[in-house]
Amino acid sequence: MSLHLSNVILHQLSKNDQEELIVNYRAESLENDTASENLVAELHRVFNSKAGKGFGSFKSDSEFQQSLHEFRAGEQSFYDFSQKSALRLKDELSKYPFADEGTLVLAEYQSLATDYLFIGLLPSNQSLKVTEGLDISATDYLDISKMDIVARLDLSTYDTDKESNRYLTYIKGRVGRKVADFFLDFLQAEVGLDAKQQNQVLMQAVEDFVSDSKLEKEEAISYKKQVADYCNEQLKAGDEVQVRELSGELPASTDGTSFFDYTSEQGYELEDSFPADRATMRKLTKFVGAGGGLNVSFDSLLLGERIFYDPETDTLTIKGTPPNLRDQLTRNKS
């Protein structure tokens, strides 16, 4: 990938004998060599592939934002900025039960004509290696795929549109760890774009458009599949859903109204673009549900053909089961 690295540095967060989190500062920034570029390129790639991201923007009194401004204005060096950030990260992280040790990475770089600032605490893991003497020894490595205490600032958007509610991106982390709360506090930022909510609004707009257009069942299913296919392709490419672009790929209603015009006229509060959510978009073409030991998923076109639902008795009837399921049921019965 095309990546231009401006600055990158590592600091270490570890616990002392009193189990207190401390910072071991690196003496200077890393050289902008091939190894450093490969590290940042991998961080960028893995971050893009992570699901469950949150978006936000700085509060007006954010000390992190002020420190960033001083660095970018040349009033302090990248090294000084990284030290202040590491100390602030340590102080904030110490308030949480998941005060992890790890390697703190700060990187300023450009990818695909967009400037970024990456901040992440990378966990380490152990593996084995074979020495020149063919002995086995333990080695530590950065477990980049497991990183979840991480945020990225889109500097290009931040410079051109400070009113944006999404130039900060962070990984929400596992349930119960409150990583999202931590990063918002650390950066002194507030929640901005809700990507999942945007996907839900899009799905509702599609459902309403199909209903108002009075499409036949097959046409409605085809229309929803086009939307789902577009969103999945955007996900695979690492791109966002562009509402106007999506509308251009969809047929207009019988009176000639495009999907984009429909969402505008009906007052759906959709951003021009937003990240696709696979789980939400999946519901356009499938019925999905789980609970009480039951997990059900089937293509929406099967409803009324092989699968029937009676709301009065809350009964789902399936005609023709998958061969592997039928085999299990038959063997269990005997």
UniProtKB/Swiss-Prot annotation:
Annotated keywords: Cytoplasm
InterPro entries: Nucleoid_associated_NdpA
Location within or outside the cell: Cytoplasm, Nucleoid
Top-level lineage group: Bacteria
Pfam families noted in UniProt: NA37 (PF04245)
GO cellular component: bacterial nucleoid; cytoplasm
Molecular function per GO: double-stranded DNA binding; single-stranded RNA binding
Cytoplasm recorded as keyword: yes
PANTHER family: NUCLEOID-ASSOCIATED PROTEIN YEJK (PTHR38772:SF1), PTHR38772
Family to which the UniProt record says this protein belongs: Belongs to the YejK family.
This protein's name: Nucleoid-associated protein VS_0951
Organism, as annotated: Vibrio atlanticus (strain LGP32)
